[in-house]
């Protein structure tokens, strides 16, 4: 199935946490004939379509027609996490008769955008299971939490809003007498005894469904409003690109790979983030399973290429002065190639040319993004993955507004174009003279 704006809406609404992103992608892969491999098991030496999951990260590859040890990799990398408000380990508070859940900002969250929203809870419970531990996804889509704004009449300064993340972003969830703890309530909703919960990785999510909005063009809405576009839009586009790659073309000299990592928003320095050994170890095991050696693996990296797929800033109509004037970026105008001389993005001339060629072959326009020199620039998994693996890397994305807000905005028509460009990147022969 080709990537569509409706498909992205369904993907996001099904995936309120990084754990759910991996579960959603895994479900699609299993339905397409992929087989899940556990890292602790011996991997088969038969070429095929496989994926492996490490907590909130996943790597999938299609080596069904490519068993040769020198076939290069074509990789799309993205991240599964988004800035949000997470539940503290001991969250229960009683303040002025209100039952309060203490929350912690995750990543560069735009705090004010989370105020006065109906919030659900999602994440993972680690539960005692006999003599061991099992991990269960949890999702509550009822509006049980809300972070209330201060009334304007009580504000010290009505012209600006300053939020203290320790004092001002805790959520209310009731009044009066309450016997159970918040984690106990979540456990009960998940069908688990509270006493059996050994750990809880819980976070809030906005309950407003993703939506196609704006003026219609040929009967189709032009804009897509949703939470977590950064970076679930890239996870979805990369997943659809991998699934759409023609299997027969895999015998022409490459192995397409999708790698989606947790913890990008907090630096990627975790056991399953982009700074971990996850991608490099999976790639090496693919080579070893095909009968190759570590020498074959190291040689193979030099001919491989990675597209770090993360969302890009569209020029904001209300703040055009915050953007590089000679590099305007529009929504519904094609994928974005991101360049930064100080390597906040991993793109160089070689990889930029490769992605430009992929866009041409996909028949989609491409835009080029440069950040203002007088503003600090964010980064991606691109430089980290490139440094970890040595694989030539290009940073790309789709244009959006309101990045890191609880609710973000992108062009509806960019979804298909973005995925088509990534598919061409995975499937095109990008040889050099």
UniProtKB/Swiss-Prot annotation:
Requisite cofactors: Zn(2+)
CDD domains: M18_DAP
Family the entry assigns: Belongs to the peptidase M18 family.
Lineage top rank: taxon: Bacteria
PANTHER family cross-referenced by the UniProt entry: ASPARTYL AMINOPEPTIDASE (PTHR28570:SF3)
UniProt keyword terms in alphabetical order: Aminopeptidase, Hydrolase, Metal-binding, Metalloprotease, Protease, Zinc
Gene Ontology CC annotation, any one: cytoplasm
Keyword tRNA-binding: no
Binding-site list for Zn(2+): 79, 153, 404
HAMAP family: Aminopeptidase_M18_2
GO annotation terms (biological process): proteolysis
Record-given protein name: Probable M18 family aminopeptidase 2
One Pfam family named in its UniProt record: Peptidase_M18
Organism encoding this protein: Mycobacterium bovis (strain ATCC BAA-935 / AF2122/97)
Organism lineage: Bacteria, Bacillati, Actinomycetota, Actinomycetes, Mycobacteriales
EC number(s) recorded for this UniProt protein: 3.4.11.-
A GO molecular-function annotation: metallopeptidase activity
Record InterPro entries: M18_aminopeptidase_2, Peptidase_M18, Peptidase_M18_dom2
